[in-house]
Amino acid sequence: MATYISVFYSKFALLDKTNLANIKIMAQEDVFKKLVSHCKEYGFVFPSSEIYDGLGAVYDYGQYGVELKNNIKKYWWDSMTLLHENVVGIDSAIFMHPTIWKASGHVDAFNDPLIDNKDSKKRYRADVLIEDHLAKIEEKINKEVAKAAKKFGDAFDEAKFRETNPRVLEHQAKWNEIHARYSKDMNDSNFEDLRQLILDCEIVCPISGTRNWTDVRQFNLMFSTEMGSTADGAMKVYLRPETAQGIFVNFLNVQKTGRMKVPFGIAQIGKAFRNEIVARQFIFRMREFEQMEMQFFVKPGTELDWFKSWKATRLKWHKALGFGDDHYRYHDHDKLAHYANAATDIEFLMPFGFKEVEGIHSRTNFDLSQHEKFSGKNIKYFDPETNESYTPYVIETSIGVDRMFLSIMSASYCEETLDSGESRVVLKLPAALAPVKLAVMPLVKKDGLPEKAREIIDNLKFHFHCQYDEKDSIGKRYRRQDEIGTPLCITVDFQTVGDDKVEADNC
């Protein structure tokens, strides 16, 4: 059937100047609470094991959540492996030889600095307490700027205001002092002064409200288990804390079988596990999560140029989703991981502030060199153009799928107030990522309209994720599609049966 679709853009298609006034302005905390509630109510994310009262920081993705998540992964995978001829994929095992994690440094160095409040008996990451304190100072600065911008309007010079306003300068000096000391303590693993910094900043426990803190100590984040038939003969293995090492140990396998020449990349999507003590903010920080990582192997001496190149490429990829430049920023690292000589984060404006969604790192040749040392195998690359062997340097791009999911949901969530005063939720997801691409709805459940709607579904379901809906009024059905982010709805009416034309609407 050749169906002609005439498209009428609804007033809810875009957030333009005519309907911005109808958007309900909410505090960011309220937005986040409503978003979490919406995710559960409409089948995006559920607490795991909920009938058993759940399991901390573990979540399940519902029928629409899994579709959105799969679309995010496909969007990333295709951009890596289809748009770049020199990037290929791999799927390595979660369980790997335990010596891999010794070589990578995870056994000895994959730790978080923890501190307990003696009154509440609650445990916190010391670095997170300080970072939250810094964020509060930054928020004070931003409030001063926003207040001045409102007062002076178009004549407001933000840069000059930040350089001259006494209150802003006072807050900024305090921020700089704390941040410099914090960075030094973390770099030097000076946990005694890290605790003293928490005391000097008068940081209190959110539960007890007291400053009765223990000493700071290290806690390894890897989950371990045993592999083998008996306790005596079992081997201690780990649930991988990252997907990158599976790429590194397969470097030569992929390079030789794929006849790859440096520079080239290996991409992977997979689950990782970290025993986070302070897991929080819904799916932003979980103990079981999914990563999208690409390791790009380059000739030594070229790594910083490639780092800059991938840094720019990855930001463009994020901005292509259309949420606006003001939602993104770079955060260059003061403290570098033991394997890196350059690192930056792409941060996204979440309801709880700017947070990392992707990390780009120049990992040097640390990982390949370590695996060569611990395995005793030669993992060097022979360059046929220069007739030399060397250990490639690596540029890494790493995204948390769950964080990406949360960033997209938070940027897409809109609450509108209609002329009647009634409130409605519209999830303005990018069409390429929407769980359901097309909803087909007969105007009534008789006179051949349902059959015609089913015929349209049958013609389109192999190309798009479609949904048929005949329950309730046509207005309520449109609202349901708005709430799950469906970009296009087709209404089959009496005219459709006669001339094969349908009315379509951008939800």
Predicted regions, residues:
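Short hydrophobic alpha-helical segments enriched in small aliphatic residues
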Residues: I5-V7, A13
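NTP/phosphate- and nucleic-acid-binding module
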Residues: N22-C507
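Short hydrophobic targeting helices and cationic amphipathic motifs
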Residues: Y9-S10, L20
